[in-house]
Protein backbone atom coordinates (compact mmCIF):
# COMPACT_ATOMS: atom_id res chain seq x y z
CA UNK A 1 0.00 0.00 0.00
CA UNK A 2 2.75 2.35 0.85
CA UNK A 3 4.43 1.56 -2.42
CA UNK A 4 1.29 2.20 -4.30
CA UNK A 5 0.82 5.49 -2.56
CA UNK A 6 4.42 6.39 -3.25
CA UNK A 7 4.07 5.49 -6.91
CA UNK A 8 0.91 7.46 -7.13
CA UNK A 9 2.63 10.39 -5.53
CA UNK A 10 5.52 10.13 -7.92
CA UNK A 11 3.21 9.88 -10.88
CA UNK A 12 1.34 12.86 -9.68
CA UNK A 13 4.51 14.83 -9.32
CA UNK A 14 5.65 13.67 -12.74
CA UNK A 15 2.38 14.67 -14.20
CA UNK A 16 2.54 17.97 -12.43
CA UNK A 17 6.05 18.61 -13.62
CA UNK A 18 5.21 17.54 -17.14
CA UNK A 19 2.08 19.64 -17.15
CA UNK A 20 3.62 22.92 -15.97
CA UNK A 21 5.62 23.80 -19.16
CA UNK A 22 2.62 23.21 -21.35
CA UNK A 23 0.57 25.51 -19.17
CA UNK A 24 3.27 28.17 -19.32
CA UNK A 25 3.42 27.74 -23.09
CA UNK A 26 -0.29 27.92 -23.23
CA UNK A 27 -0.20 31.00 -21.04
CA UNK A 28 2.48 32.54 -23.19
CA UNK A 29 0.55 31.69 -26.33
CA UNK A 30 -2.62 33.03 -24.83
CA UNK A 31 -0.82 36.16 -23.67
CA UNK A 32 0.73 36.51 -27.11
CA UNK A 33 -2.64 36.10 -28.71
CA UNK A 34 -4.09 38.60 -26.28
CA UNK A 35 -1.33 41.08 -27.04
CA UNK A 36 -1.82 40.57 -30.75
CA UNK A 37 -5.55 40.96 -30.35
CA UNK A 38 -4.98 44.05 -28.28
CA UNK A 39 -2.56 45.41 -30.86
CA UNK A 40 -4.99 44.66 -33.66
CA UNK A 41 -7.77 46.25 -31.70
CA UNK A 42 -5.59 49.24 -30.98
CA UNK A 43 -4.68 49.53 -34.64
CA UNK A 44 -8.32 49.13 -35.61
CA UNK A 45 -9.27 51.78 -33.10
CA UNK A 46 -6.59 54.09 -34.49
CA UNK A 47 -7.79 53.42 -38.01
CA UNK A 48 -11.35 53.96 -36.89
CA UNK A 49 -10.43 57.15 -35.07
CA UNK A 50 -8.46 58.38 -38.06
CA UNK A 51 -11.31 57.46 -40.35
CA UNK A 52 -13.75 59.17 -37.99
CA UNK A 53 -11.51 62.21 -37.78
CA UNK A 54 -11.21 62.32 -41.55
CA UNK A 55 -14.92 61.87 -41.85
CA UNK A 56 -15.48 64.52 -39.19
CA UNK A 57 -13.12 66.87 -41.01
CA UNK A 58 -14.89 66.16 -44.27
CA UNK A 59 -18.23 66.62 -42.56
CA UNK A 60 -16.97 69.85 -40.98
CA UNK A 61 -15.71 71.05 -44.33
CA UNK A 62 -19.00 70.05 -45.91
CA UNK A 63 -20.89 71.82 -43.16
CA UNK A 64 -18.65 74.89 -43.55
CA UNK A 65 -19.17 74.84 -47.30
CA UNK A 66 -22.89 74.41 -46.81
CA UNK A 67 -23.00 77.24 -44.27
CA UNK A 68 -20.96 79.45 -46.61
CA UNK A 69 -23.30 78.62 -49.49
CA UNK A 70 -26.31 79.29 -47.30
CA UNK A 71 -24.85 82.59 -46.03
CA UNK A 72 -23.94 83.56 -49.60
CA UNK A 73 -27.42 82.71 -50.79
CA UNK A 74 -28.92 84.62 -47.86
CA UNK A 75 -26.66 87.62 -48.57
CA UNK A 76 -27.56 87.45 -52.24
CA UNK A 77 -31.20 87.25 -51.33
CA UNK A 78 -30.82 90.19 -48.95
CA UNK A 79 -28.87 92.16 -51.57
CA UNK A 80 -31.56 91.38 -54.10
CA UNK A 81 -34.23 92.42 -51.66
CA UNK A 82 -32.34 95.63 -50.86
CA UNK A 83 -31.82 96.33 -54.57
CA UNK A 84 -35.45 95.68 -55.25
CA UNK A 85 -36.43 97.83 -52.30
CA UNK A 86 -34.04 100.57 -53.47
CA UNK A 87 -35.41 100.38 -56.98
CA UNK A 88 -38.96 100.50 -55.66
CA UNK A 89 -38.02 103.41 -53.36
CA UNK A 90 -36.30 105.22 -56.23
CA UNK A 91 -39.27 104.60 -58.46
CA UNK A 92 -41.57 105.85 -55.71
CA UNK A 93 -39.45 108.93 -55.16
CA UNK A 94 -39.32 109.58 -58.90
CA UNK A 95 -43.06 109.10 -59.09
CA UNK A 96 -43.65 111.45 -56.19
CA UNK A 97 -41.18 113.95 -57.62
CA UNK A 98 -42.90 113.68 -60.99
CA UNK A 99 -46.30 114.22 -59.39
CA UNK A 100 -44.95 117.19 -57.42
CA UNK A 101 -43.38 118.64 -60.58
CA UNK A 102 -46.62 118.16 -62.47
CA UNK A 103 -48.58 119.67 -59.59
CA UNK A 104 -46.11 122.58 -59.41
CA UNK A 105 -46.32 123.13 -63.15
CA UNK A 106 -50.11 122.98 -63.04
CA UNK A 107 -50.10 125.39 -60.07
CA UNK A 108 -47.75 127.76 -61.85
CA UNK A 109 -49.78 127.48 -65.01
CA UNK A 110 -52.93 128.16 -63.01
CA UNK A 111 -51.34 131.14 -61.29
CA UNK A 112 -50.07 132.47 -64.59
CA UNK A 113 -53.50 131.94 -66.09
CA UNK A 114 -55.15 133.72 -63.20
CA UNK A 115 -52.56 136.49 -63.35
CA UNK A 116 -53.16 136.76 -67.07
CA UNK A 117 -56.90 136.88 -66.55
CA UNK A 118 -56.52 139.49 -63.81
CA UNK A 119 -54.10 141.47 -65.96
CA UNK A 120 -56.50 141.25 -68.88
CA UNK A 121 -59.36 142.27 -66.66
CA UNK A 122 -57.29 145.14 -65.28
CA UNK A 123 -56.37 146.30 -68.77
CA UNK A 124 -59.96 146.01 -69.88
CA UNK A 125 -61.05 147.91 -66.75
CA UNK A 126 -58.43 150.59 -67.37
CA UNK A 127 -59.41 150.81 -70.99
CA UNK A 128 -63.04 151.01 -69.94
CA UNK A 129 -62.32 153.78 -67.46
CA UNK A 130 -60.27 155.70 -69.99
CA UNK A 131 -62.92 155.13 -72.60
CA UNK A 132 -65.59 156.24 -70.15
CA UNK A 133 -63.60 159.33 -69.24
CA UNK A 134 -63.07 160.16 -72.90
CA UNK A 135 -66.74 159.60 -73.61
CA UNK A 136 -67.70 161.78 -70.66
CA UNK A 137 -65.28 164.48 -71.76
CA UNK A 138 -66.54 164.32 -75.32
CA UNK A 139 -70.12 164.32 -74.15
CA UNK A 140 -69.39 167.24 -71.85
CA UNK A 141 -67.75 169.21 -74.62
CA UNK A 142 -70.59 168.47 -76.99
CA UNK A 143 -73.13 169.31 -74.30
CA UNK A 144 -71.35 172.56 -73.45
CA UNK A 145 -70.98 173.51 -77.08
CA UNK A 146 -74.49 172.60 -78.08
CA UNK A 147 -76.14 173.82 -74.89
CA UNK A 148 -77.26 170.32 -73.83
CA UNK A 149 -77.55 168.94 -70.30
CA UNK A 150 -74.76 170.27 -68.04
CA UNK A 151 -73.64 169.84 -64.42
CA UNK A 152 -70.86 170.94 -62.03
CA UNK A 153 -69.10 167.62 -62.72
CA UNK A 154 -69.12 168.28 -66.42
CA UNK A 155 -67.79 171.81 -65.87
CA UNK A 156 -65.00 170.44 -63.68
CA UNK A 157 -63.95 167.89 -66.32
CA UNK A 158 -63.97 170.47 -69.10
CA UNK A 159 -61.83 173.00 -67.20
CA UNK A 160 -59.47 170.34 -65.85
CA UNK A 161 -58.77 168.87 -69.29
CA UNK A 162 -58.22 172.34 -70.77
CA UNK A 163 -55.72 173.33 -68.06
CA UNK A 164 -53.88 169.98 -68.37
CA UNK A 165 -53.32 170.63 -72.05
CA UNK A 166 -52.00 174.13 -71.27
CA UNK A 167 -49.57 172.68 -68.69
CA UNK A 168 -48.12 170.30 -71.25
CA UNK A 169 -45.18 172.59 -72.02
CA UNK A 170 -42.31 171.67 -74.35
CA UNK A 171 -39.42 173.02 -72.28
CA UNK A 172 -36.29 170.89 -72.91
CA UNK A 173 -34.43 171.83 -69.75
CA UNK A 174 -35.86 169.55 -67.07
CA UNK A 175 -34.66 171.76 -64.23
CA UNK A 176 -36.44 174.81 -65.62
CA UNK A 177 -39.46 172.71 -66.59
CA UNK A 178 -39.96 171.61 -62.97
CA UNK A 179 -40.13 175.30 -61.89
CA UNK A 180 -42.56 176.18 -64.69
CA UNK A 181 -44.93 173.32 -63.87
CA UNK A 182 -44.86 174.23 -60.19
CA UNK A 183 -45.81 177.85 -61.03
CA UNK A 184 -48.62 176.75 -63.37
CA UNK A 185 -50.02 174.36 -60.76
CA UNK A 186 -49.94 176.93 -57.98
CA UNK A 187 -50.99 180.08 -59.85
CA UNK A 188 -53.37 178.75 -62.49
CA UNK A 189 -54.66 175.20 -62.01
CA UNK A 190 -55.57 175.16 -58.30
CA UNK A 191 -57.42 178.51 -57.99
CA UNK A 192 -59.31 178.04 -61.26
CA UNK A 193 -60.53 174.53 -60.36
CA UNK A 194 -61.71 175.77 -56.98
CA UNK A 195 -63.61 178.60 -58.64
CA UNK A 196 -65.54 176.55 -61.23
CA UNK A 197 -66.54 173.72 -58.85
CA UNK A 198 -70.05 175.07 -58.30
CA UNK A 199 -70.82 176.21 -61.85
CA UNK A 200 -73.40 174.01 -63.56
CA UNK A 201 -73.15 175.35 -67.12
CA UNK A 202 -69.73 175.23 -68.70
CA UNK A 203 -71.09 177.00 -71.76
CA UNK A 204 -71.47 180.18 -69.73
CA UNK A 205 -67.74 180.43 -68.88
CA UNK A 206 -66.24 178.72 -71.92
CA UNK A 207 -65.24 181.97 -73.69
CA UNK A 208 -63.15 183.02 -70.65
CA UNK A 209 -60.55 180.39 -71.67
CA UNK A 210 -60.27 181.38 -75.33
CA UNK A 211 -56.88 183.12 -75.19
CA UNK A 212 -55.53 181.44 -72.04
CA UNK A 213 -53.34 178.86 -73.84
CA UNK A 214 -51.60 181.50 -76.00
CA UNK A 215 -51.02 183.82 -73.04
CA UNK A 216 -49.44 181.03 -70.96
CA UNK A 217 -47.26 179.90 -73.87
CA UNK A 218 -45.92 183.45 -74.24
CA UNK A 219 -45.10 183.63 -70.52
CA UNK A 220 -43.27 180.26 -70.66
CA UNK A 221 -41.14 181.38 -73.59
CA UNK A 222 -40.13 184.51 -71.69
CA UNK A 223 -39.12 182.34 -68.74
CA UNK A 224 -36.91 180.19 -70.96
CA UNK A 225 -35.15 183.30 -72.25
CA UNK A 226 -34.65 184.66 -68.73
CA UNK A 227 -33.24 181.31 -67.58
CA UNK A 228 -30.72 181.19 -70.43
CA UNK A 229 -29.49 184.67 -69.56
CA UNK A 230 -29.18 183.77 -65.89
CA UNK A 231 -27.36 180.50 -66.66
CA UNK A 232 -24.48 182.40 -68.25
CA UNK A 233 -23.40 183.28 -64.75
CA UNK A 234 -22.00 179.94 -63.55
CA UNK A 235 -21.81 181.16 -59.97
CA UNK A 236 -25.54 181.94 -59.71
CA UNK A 237 -27.41 178.96 -58.15
CA UNK A 238 -30.85 180.64 -58.25
CA UNK A 239 -31.56 180.70 -61.97
CA UNK A 240 -34.54 178.40 -61.56
CA UNK A 241 -36.47 180.85 -59.43
CA UNK A 242 -35.09 183.98 -61.11
CA UNK A 243 -35.87 182.63 -64.56
CA UNK A 244 -39.49 181.96 -63.62
CA UNK A 245 -40.08 185.18 -61.67
CA UNK A 246 -41.71 186.91 -64.65
CA UNK A 247 -43.75 183.77 -65.27
CA UNK A 248 -44.99 183.80 -61.70
CA UNK A 249 -46.00 187.47 -61.88
CA UNK A 250 -47.58 187.05 -65.30
CA UNK A 251 -49.62 184.00 -64.15
CA UNK A 252 -50.94 185.92 -61.14
CA UNK A 253 -52.24 188.70 -63.42
CA UNK A 254 -53.62 186.26 -65.99
CA UNK A 255 -55.39 184.14 -63.41
CA UNK A 256 -56.99 187.24 -61.88
CA UNK A 257 -58.29 188.23 -65.29
CA UNK A 258 -59.63 184.68 -65.79
CA UNK A 259 -61.33 184.66 -62.38
CA UNK A 260 -63.04 187.99 -63.04
CA UNK A 261 -64.41 186.65 -66.31
CA UNK A 262 -65.66 183.41 -64.71
CA UNK A 263 -67.38 185.21 -61.85
CA UNK A 264 -68.98 187.67 -64.25
CA UNK A 265 -70.28 184.90 -66.52
CA UNK A 266 -71.41 182.81 -63.57
CA UNK A 267 -73.50 185.60 -62.07
CA UNK A 268 -75.04 186.69 -65.35
CA UNK A 269 -78.46 185.39 -66.36
UniProtKB/Swiss-Prot annotation:
**Other notes:** Protects mice from collagen-induced thrombus formation in a murine model of lethal pulmonary thromboembolism.
Output a single Gene Ontology CC term carried by this record: extracellular region
**Start and end residues of each stretch annotated as GE-rich region which mediates binding of Ca(2+):** 38-148
Give the species this sequence originates from: Anopheles stephensi (Indo-Pakistan malaria mosquito)
Q: Where is this region: Mediates binding of host collagen and inhibition of platelet aggregation?
A: 148-269
Identification of the protein by name: Aegyptin-like protein
Keyword flag Secreted: yes
Q: Which InterPro entries match?
A: Aegyptin-like, ALL3/gSG7_salivary-like_helix
Q: Does the keyword Ribonucleoprotein apply?
A: no
Disulfide bonds, paired cysteine numbers: 208-261, 230-239
Positions with biased composition (Acidic residues) = 56-73, 98-121, 131-149
- UniProt keywords, alphabetically: Calcium, Disulfide bond, Hemostasis impairing toxin, IgE-binding protein, Platelet aggregation inhibiting toxin, Secreted, Signal, Toxin
UniProt lists the gene as AAPP
Q: Which residues form the signal peptide?
A: 1-19
Amino acid sequence: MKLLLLLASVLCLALIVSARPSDETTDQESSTELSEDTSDSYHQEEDTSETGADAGTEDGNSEDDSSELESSSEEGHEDGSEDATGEEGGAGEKGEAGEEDEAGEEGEAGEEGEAGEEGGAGEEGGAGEEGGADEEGSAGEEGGAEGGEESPVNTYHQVHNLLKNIMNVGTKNNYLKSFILARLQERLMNPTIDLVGSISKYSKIKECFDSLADDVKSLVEKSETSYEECSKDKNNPHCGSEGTRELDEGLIEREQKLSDCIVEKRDSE
